[in-house]
Amino acid sequence: MSREFKRSDRVAQELQKEIAVILQREVKDPRIGMVTVSDVEVSRDLAYAKIFVTFLFDNDQSVIEQGMKGLEKASPYIRSLVGKAMRLRIVPELRFIYDQSLVEGMRMSNLVSNVIKNDEAKHKEEE
């Protein structure tokens, strides 16, 4: 009987929860601000983890770059807190990656909304 989920998937899910809590409560770096953990991918041997993050309310590229630098600087501290919170033989090395999918999704949603408004305005003019 095969398992429904791989162990790396379960670890990634738990890691996402723990890192979100740690970033919210423990990390005091002002560069980080309102950060959201959107996804976590863990390697099969659980040695590496890619943490995909987005910054809420920040569209400025320089603010995002500063936030990413802050996360990279805090990475060893976050890893140590993850090690205390989760019972793992090997605590994964954390790599933070900026996730643009949320920003792109909002942009696409705005484009669709604008097209719908323009289409409705044209139909009202024709009547």
Curated annotation (Swiss-Prot):
Q: Quaternary state and partners of this protein?
A: Monomer. Binds 30S ribosomal subunits, but not 50S ribosomal subunits or 70S ribosomes.
Keyword NAD set for record: no
Q: What name does this protein carry?
A: Ribosome-binding factor A
Signal peptide positions (record) = none
Q: Where is the protein found, in the record's own terms?
A: Cytoplasm
* Biological process, per Gene Ontology: maturation of SSU-rRNA
Recorded hits in Pfam families, A to Z, give: RBFA
Q: What does this protein do?
A: One of several proteins that assist in the late maturation steps of the functional core of the 30S ribosomal subunit. Associates with free 30S ribosomal subunits (but not with 30S subunits that are part of 70S ribosomes or polysomes). Required for efficient processing of 16S rRNA. May interact with the 5'-terminal helix region of 16S rRNA.
Q: Which organism is the protein's source?
A: Actinobacillus pleuropneumoniae serotype 5b (strain L20)
Checking NCBIfam families in the record gives: rbfA (TIGR00082)
What lineage, starting at the top, does this entry show? Bacteria, Pseudomonadati, Pseudomonadota, Gammaproteobacteria, Pasteurellales
- Asked if the Swiss-Prot or TrEMBL record annotates the protein with the keyword Transcription, the reply is no
Question: Cellular component terms, GO, for this chain's entry?
Answer: cytosol
Mention one GO molecular function: ribosomal small subunit binding
- Gene name of the encoded protein: rbfA
- What protein family does this chain belong to? Belongs to the RbfA family.
Q: Which domain of life is it from?
A: Bacteria
Keywords on this record? Cytoplasm, Ribosome biogenesis
